[in-house]
Amino acid sequence: MKLFKVVALTVVLIMVVALLVLRMTGLPPGHPSAEDYMTAGRSARPGLWLKGEVVREAVTNWDWVSQFGDAFAENGSELETRTWYGIPHSVTVLLVPRGEELYLMSSAQTFRLGRAFPDGKAWWRNVERDPRVRLKIGGEIYEMTAVLVRDRAEVARLRGGRDPIVRSIDDNGNEYVSEEWHYWRVFQRNIPEYDSGMTAGASD
């Protein structure tokens, strides 16, 4: 019993030290190739803390974000969400810039379609519980608040008129839902307003 306690304590200490190191160094999510992503069942290794210089200036035009729009590239944009157990969960994400507005988009496909929103992805659940997120774009960190776009017509507009519920036909001629798209509007937080000096968005 004494040996078991020593081993257990050693394992706990190693885990604590490892987490402290990762808190300082960061652990970004994996950036697999498109082929590897599909082979892994449309999944990629999640990360923990994202590291980078935090941007404190308000962004008035997000169109430049398009250059980081390839989620499979090493410079793809990343999202850090807050878990209930206190250790961040980060993933690569697809961003949709619309001038002064910025959106996140994500889809449920294959096995995830069998789960009700937001249970299809861990980060969806995290954002629904706590909308305070951090985006890493071009090596810099943006503290944001993510708000789900619940209006299906608005999501269709963001998708260029395409329905967020995508239907396909199987080999037997039967129609089925093959994709379900979700969008979040993201707002900067902890940013001084231009004139009032107040802080924009929710604070930590």
Report each predicted region and the residues it spans:
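N-terminal Sec-pathway targeting helices
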Residues: M1-V17
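Membrane-interface motif at the C-terminal end of an N-terminal transmembrane signal
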Residues: I14-A34
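Short N-terminal helix-initiation segments at or just after the protein's N-terminus
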Residues: L22, G26, G69-T83, V127, ...
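Short, conserved active-site entrance elements at the starts or edges of catalytic domains
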Residues: L27-P88
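Short, structured beta-strand-loop surface elements
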Residues: T39-V54, T110-D204
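Generic detector of short, locally flexible boundary/turn motifs and exposed helical patches
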Residues: S43-A44, R56-F72, G99-Y103, A108-L113, ...
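Short beta-strand segments
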Residues: E74-A116, E143-M144
